[in-house]
Amino acid sequence: MLDYDREAAHYDATRGGNARAGAAADAIETLLPAAAEGVTRIVDAGCGTGIVTVRLARPGRSVIGIDRSAGLAAVAASRLPGRIALGSVIRLPLASGSVDVVTMVWLLHLLSAADSAEAVAEAGRVLSPGGLLITTVGKNDAAFGPADDAAMIVGVVRARFGHDQTDRLNRVIELGRRQGLALAAQTTFVGMGQGVSPRRWRHRLAGDAISWTGAAGRERVDALCAELAGLSDQDRARPDPVYQLAALRKG
């Protein structure tokens, strides 16, 4: 499992940095409710380094970030001083009905089935009536676009041996329904700089970065790497993934 405290210093640089974060924040903006009287209370649950969180902050909003990693939270606090708290997304340190928006960006796919269900339940608990949960869905599916020759090769094996995704849209909708949340809107955004070259796919498959390689077996993974090695332009990044965002409204 990734040591987030140890990774904190260079976490953003290995995950698309400002370009990807900016695209995510811009997409979230299109789903946020129109400005109303008073202050819109936004909580970024699992905020990581705060690279998206800080982009949501502006006059008329009270934005806080929550993360369980002290290392990531420290980076986030340097971006939003006094607005970051240590805490778990399955036990948010917030009163029931106390916020207008909960965002979860690239979070649910990292959690187990049980914890992702708890995270959605917690979002439902802390949201006020009419509030929104805005979350990425199907995060890992985004890398397997039809225009990507390398990903299509990998996708055949992944479809057979990959684990069920805890952030599938239909699953998130069902989890939300149990908490009185209903799908209100969807949008997409491009994961800038996240396209993967055939050589990088081979590197990932050879290491332990992909969870299903153990189930596939070394012989099958080696054959997959050999097929990838036969593609042209080994170091050319393929198209950037297109991520999905869903907004669920509390009734």
Predicted regions and their residues:
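Conserved Class I S-adenosyl-L-methionine
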Residues: 182-251
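Short catalytic micro-motifs in class I SAM-dependent methyltransferases
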Residues: 106-110
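Conserved class I S-adenosyl-L-methionine
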Residues: 1-38, 51-55, 72-75, 132-163, 206
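Class I SAM-dependent methyltransferase SAM/SAH-binding core
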Residues: 41-91
